[in-house]
């Protein structure tokens, strides 16, 4: 799993990725599976 945001690489747990496909951290975040 790889997440790309304006702040750079943001690591997330696999279980969190499975629960939500789109993660919003206050900035534009794109989730690529």
From Swiss-Prot:
Give this protein's Gene Ontology molecular function annotations.
lipid binding
Q: What is this protein called?
A: Fatty acid-binding protein, intestinal
What does the tissue specificity note say? Intestine.
Function in brief: FABPs are thought to play a role in the intracellular transport of long-chain fatty acids and their acyl-CoA esters.
Q: Does the keyword Plastid apply?
A: no
Task: Tell me the name of the encoding gene.
Answer: fabp2
- Protein source organism: Rhamdia sapo
Q: Which family does it belong to?
A: Belongs to the calycin superfamily. Fatty-acid binding protein (FABP) family.
Localization per record: Cytoplasm
Cite a GO CC annotation. Answer: cytoplasm
Ordered alphabetically, the record's keywords are: Cytoplasm, Lipid-binding, Transport
